């Protein structure tokens, strides 16, 4: 899980979602998981 000020999809499998008010990226590649904050 990377924590970044700005989250962007890194590949075609990345999805930007909102969970509990946080913007997150979920992906089939675990290296691409990101969270804002």
From Swiss-Prot:
* One BP annotation, GO: translation
Q: May I have one GO cellular component term?
A: cytoplasm
A Pfam family this protein belongs to? Answer: Ribosomal_L36
Q: What disulfide bonds does the UniProt entry report for this chain?
A: none
Q: Which InterPro entries match?
A: Ribosomal_bL36, Ribosomal_bL36_sp
**GO MF terms, alphabetically ordered:** structural constituent of ribosome
Q: Which family does it belong to?
A: Belongs to the bacterial ribosomal protein bL36 family.
User: What is the protein name given in its UniProt record?
Assistant: Large ribosomal subunit protein bL36
Organism field: Ligilactobacillus salivarius (strain UCC118)
**Could you tell me the gene encoding this protein?**
rpmJ
